[in-house]
């Protein structure tokens, strides 16, 4: 796979209020460091200089975040009103996301609901990472839910691997990476939460991709599905052998699923057979949260959420 460049910006959804880009792997969203010669913000400014907003720190309002190593769907609001409508959807947990990943080992169950609370790791040398509740040094763990559905079993560079669809039902920092690791099936190429690998054997990227995104704002339903990057034709190291569930069927279920009710506490799982906790009515927005929203509308922070 080719590394990112200023020219290879892929747009998968565009309207007068929003863009959804297919972010390249190993690409930062934005940065104040002069050494970062290529960021998504710089790509956008290069391709859409007329859409840059001089009132923001980076010129564009990113509605959510992806890790440096994660590729896939990322939504950009093109004005303050659009950013506010997207913020409301995220606040009310009405956004639907689905990711593709290659994970180590053959996951035996076709569907798993991962329910581990996640907190910040306070252990010396690991303070930039997250961990599950019960881990030494885990601070302020919060309830976290991820639905995992197995698509294929196969080999990656000769090692057993499963291709999975991940649907986060909550939105904690590094949630998918932490949950897969806690399940005993770390994401291939995840050097932070995965298995220690020899330098020569490391894959060219972390195998996590934001595949599907839906943000049901009041004015429009922002919906985008990005190309699947984990195909043998694109990566000869990946050799699937068994199909467990067809991806097309699961994505069709996502597309036809009704938008989550803002009072239900979040999106529903892909399969109605798996019961999920249903939190009560969300509490009113506090003054601190309101101030945070206003700051969010004017500029962007750098902390990743996957």
Curated annotation (Swiss-Prot):
<keyword id="KW-0007">Acetylation</keyword>
<dbReference type="InterPro" id="IPR050188">
    <property type="entry name" value="RluA_PseudoU_synthase"/>
</dbReference>
<dbReference type="GO" id="GO:0003723">
    <property type="term" value="F:RNA binding"/>
</dbReference>
<comment type="similarity">
    <text>Belongs to the pseudouridine synthase RluA family.</text>
</comment>
<dbReference type="InterPro" id="IPR006145">
    <property type="entry name" value="PsdUridine_synth_RsuA/RluA"/>
</dbReference>
<dbReference type="GO" id="GO:0009982">
    <property type="term" value="F:pseudouridine synthase activity"/>
</dbReference>
<feature type="region of interest" description="Disordered">
    <location>
        <begin position="255"/>
        <end position="290"/>
    </location>
</feature>
<feature type="compositionally biased region" description="Pro residues">
    <location>
        <begin position="269"/>
        <end position="285"/>
    </location>
</feature>
<feature type="modified residue" description="N-acetylmethionine">
    <location>
        <position position="1"/>
    </location>
</feature>
<protein>
    <recommendedName>
        <fullName>RNA pseudouridylate synthase domain-containing protein 1</fullName>
    </recommendedName>
</protein>
<dbReference type="Pfam" id="PF00849">
    <property type="entry name" value="PseudoU_synth_2"/>
</dbReference>
<feature type="active site">
    <location>
        <position position="67"/>
    </location>
</feature>
<dbReference type="GO" id="GO:0001522">
    <property type="term" value="P:pseudouridine synthesis"/>
</dbReference>
<dbReference type="InterPro" id="IPR020103">
    <property type="entry name" value="PsdUridine_synth_cat_dom_sf"/>
</dbReference>
């Amino acid at each position: 796979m080719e590394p990112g460049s200023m020219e290879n910006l892929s747009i998968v959804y565009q309207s007068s209020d929003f863009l959804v880009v297919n972010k390249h792997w190993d690409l930062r969203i934005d940065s104040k460091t002069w050494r970062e010669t290529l960021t998504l913000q710089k790509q956008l400014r290069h391709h859409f200089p007329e859409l840059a907003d001089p009132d923001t720190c980076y010129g564009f309002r990113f509605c959510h975040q992806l890790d440096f190593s994660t590729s896939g769907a990322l939504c950009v609001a093109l004005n303050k009103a659009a950013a506010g409508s997207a913020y409301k959807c995220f606040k009310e947990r009405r956004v639907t996301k689905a990711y593709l990943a290659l994970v180590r080992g053959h996951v035996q169950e076709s569907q798993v609901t991962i329910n581990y609370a996640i907190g910040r790791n306070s252990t010396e040398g690991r303070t930039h990472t997250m961990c599950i509740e019960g881990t030494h040094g885990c601070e302020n763990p919060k309830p976290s839910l991820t639905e995992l559905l197995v698509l294929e079993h196969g080999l990656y560079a000769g090692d057993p691997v499963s291709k999975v669809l991940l649907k986060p039902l909550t939105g904690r920092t590094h949630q998918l990476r932490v949950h897969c690791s806690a399940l005993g099936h770390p994401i291939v190429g995840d050097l932070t939460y995965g298995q220690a690998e020899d330098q020569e054997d490391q894959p060219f990227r972390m195998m996590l991709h934001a595949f599907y995104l839906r943000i049901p704002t009041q004015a429009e339903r922002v919906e985008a599905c990005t190309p699947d990057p984990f195909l043998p034709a694109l990566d000869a190291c990946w050799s699937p052998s068994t199909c467990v569930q067809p991806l097309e069927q699961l994505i069709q279920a996502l597309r036809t699923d009704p938008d989550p009710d803002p009072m239900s506490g979040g999106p529903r799982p892909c399969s109605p057979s798996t019961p999920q906790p249903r939190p009560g009515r969300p509490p009113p927005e506090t003054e601190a949260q309101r101030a945070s929203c206003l700051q969010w509308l004017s500029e962007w922070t750098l902390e990743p959420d996957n």
